[in-house]
């Protein structure tokens, strides 16, 4: 397991090192928003921590990006499996029987999910991702900013919810976790003239332009449905 993001597979193997502007059409869409809502709905039913759901959606997005051919798995089956896998990765395992039962109760699937279905899809996802399953999230940078006294509890909670909302897009594949965290902090602290200078000092350590692009993309999430 790579404790250091800069040495992790997330950066060295799975990061989309491209311009956010060129990927705007695929960064946010009805599909990405719907996928995140499905993950949240199923995760809430299982009463899982937000970090588990975030890992699940990242695994789902990685898989959908890298798969070479259509396997015919339904979105619901993929979500259930990604959450099952995410629970293992985040060390809060849920029994496969519980995953199947809750999925079948929640969704009216043509074919009921079985343990063998989940195991098959789990193997497929692990194979496609070459077993690179560890996910680094922006939450760590948010917590660090709070512990360093840069932000207060209310600002931390607001930024946390903004990071949660960012998973409705594919930004998690295109920006470094700390850049997403800084973008969320800029939004949550935009009216605090005492905190903004401290955040600007933080941003100096990274690509400030990309942080601003992340701010724009995150804000667009809240307007997307109105625009559509």
Curated annotation (Swiss-Prot):
GO molecular function, one term: cyclin-dependent protein serine/threonine kinase regulator activity
The organism's place on the tree of life at top rank: Eukaryota
Lineage of the species this protein comes from: Eukaryota, Fungi, Dikarya, Ascomycota, Taphrinomycotina
Species of provenance: Schizosaccharomyces pombe (strain 972 / ATCC 24843) (Fission yeast)
PANTHER family: CYCLIN
Family statement: Belongs to the cyclin family. Cyclin C subfamily.
Function summary: Component of the Cdk8 module/Srb8-11 module which is a regulatory module of the Mediator complex that regulates basal RNA polymerase II transcription. The Cdk8 module may sterically hinder the interaction between Mediator and RNA polymerase II leading to transcriptional repression of a subset of genes regulated by Mediator.
Annotated ranges, domain Cyclin N-terminal: 10-134
GO biological process: positive regulation of transcription by RNA polymerase II
An example Gene Ontology CC term for this record: mediator complex
Gene from which this protein is expressed: srb11
Main localization of the protein described in the UniProt heading: nucleus
Annotated protein name in UniProt: RNA polymerase II holoenzyme cyclin-like subunit
Subunit architecture: Component of the Cdk8 module of the Mediator complex. The Cdk8 module is composed of srb8, srb9, srb10 and srb11.
Location of the protein in the cell: Nucleus
Keyword set, alphabetical order: Activator, Cyclin, Nucleus, Repressor, Transcription, Transcription regulation
SUPFAM superfamilies assigned to the protein according to its UniProt record, in alphabetical order: Cyclin-like (SSF47954)
InterPro entries on file: Cyclin-like_dom, Cyclin-like_sf, Cyclin/Ssn8, Cyclin_N
Pfam name, any one: Cyclin_N
């Amino acid at each position: 397991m790579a404790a250091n993001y800069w040495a992790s597979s997330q950066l060295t193997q799975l990061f989309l090192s491209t311009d956010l502007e060129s990927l705007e059409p695929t960064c946010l869409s009805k599909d990405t928003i719907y996928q995140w809502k499905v993950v949240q709905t199923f995760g809430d039913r299982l009463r899982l921590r937000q970090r588990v759901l975030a890992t699940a959606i990242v695994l789902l997005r990685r898989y959908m990006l890298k798969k070479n051919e259509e396997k015919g798995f339904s979105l619901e089956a993929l979500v259930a499996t990604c959450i099952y896998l995410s629970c293992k990765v985040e060390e809060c395992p849920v029994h496969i029987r519980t995953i199947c039962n809750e999925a079948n109760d929640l969704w009216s699937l043509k074919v009921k999910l079985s343990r063998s279905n989940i195991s098959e899809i789990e193997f497929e996802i692990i194979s496609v991702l070459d077993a690179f399953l560890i996910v680094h999230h922006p939450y760590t940078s948010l917590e660090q900013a709070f512990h360093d006294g840069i932000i207060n509890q209310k600002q931390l909670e607001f930024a946390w919810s903004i990071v949660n909302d960012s998973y409705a897009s594919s930004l998690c594949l295109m920006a470094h976790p700390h850049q997403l965290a800084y973008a969320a902090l800029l939004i949550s602290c935009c009216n605090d003239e005492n905190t903004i200078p401290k955040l600007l000092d933080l941003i100096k350590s990274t690509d400030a332009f990309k942080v601003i692009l992340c701010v724009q993309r995150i804000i667009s999430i809240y307007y997307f449905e109105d625009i559509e």
